[in-house]
Amino acid sequence: MKLKKNIFTIGATVLLLSLLSACSSSNNSSNSTDTAGNETTAKTHLVTDALGHKVEIPNQPKRIIGSYLEDYLIALGEKPVAQWTVGSGSIQHYLQKELKDVPTISYDLPYEKVLSYEPDLLLISSSATVEGGKYEQYSKIAPTYVVKNGNDVTWETQLKDIGKALNKEKAAEKIITDYQKKVKATRQELADKINGKTAAVLWVTNNSAFMVSETRSSGRIIYGDLKFGVPNLVTEISKSATSDWSAVSAEKLAELDADYLILVNSDEKAAMFNEATWQNLKAVKENHVLEFGPESSWLYNGPIASQNMVNDIKNNLK
């Protein structure tokens, strides 16, 4: 009986150890599965874009197309696989140090061309780009994220949104903070040149003049950030503006009484520069014209463009 009892005890012990071992193996297997699942999940993150699409984006995308968002991508340390162009090869010249080897893609993002670049992420700068079923087409190629856009959306808002999409929100915040510090320092350094002075930004192309709106594009930099005064003509034109730049007739241009004129000159031989209307402008007569070419950043938006514009003002007025 004693022998049988010992055998029973040993058998029970072996059975218990076997059960514990099985449970342990099961737990390890479960843990391994969970870990593998977590690792898989960690490779992507889910975000909601400007149009309400829930988009699963790689944490570290390698082949991004962000047409007309290259400024933001470069600022965040990303190099796209293709860059924006329009018309007969117009590109963002001020970004070419970083994009010189990057091929171009038309602003309207032709499907076959997009497909040929094998992107792993598409960032869309305008809701209109994906109308008419195009979003569904693009999303078959790669995760497609429509960035916040519209006339009232600032570059800071767009940068934060792109930062969210790229899992680089802290980097986006730092860029904005650094820009604000630069603006503050520039205002202080140029206080005697800015305080009480007005300025206007004028783009001349094809012998025609266009004025930037008070709250858009470079207008935000000049008036909102650097705090130059707003000339009456700029205020008037801004009220009816439907885009960043509004056409200005020669008759209206004659009313411009800005202390400083920031000229974005895309037509150096424009006849208007020799006309009385131009020669009689206050800023022209006082030699307060700051001239920049079309390859500068003054026609664009974004963190790099904005920093460049602040630097341009600082370097020309200090």
Regions found by a protein language model. Name each.
Residues 140-207, 296, 300-318:
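Extracytoplasmic substrate-binding proteins
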Residues 256-318:
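Structured C-terminal subdomain patch of bacterial secreted/periplasmic proteins
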Residues 65-113, 121, 126-127:
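A short, structured surface patch at a secondary-structure boundary
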Residues 118-124, 143, 253, 258-259:
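Proline-aspartate-enriched helix->loop->beta-strand connector
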Residues 49-51, 102-112, 240-250:
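Short helix-initiation/N-cap motifs at beta->coil->alpha
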Residues 2-12, 22-68, 171-202, 265-269, ...:
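Bacterial Sec-exported substrate-binding components of ABC uptake systems
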Residues 17-20:
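Bacterial Sec-type N-terminal signal peptides, specifically the leucine/valine-rich hydrophobic h-region
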Residues 88-92, 211-244:
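Alpha-helical, coiled-coil/dimerization segments enriched in small aliphatic residues
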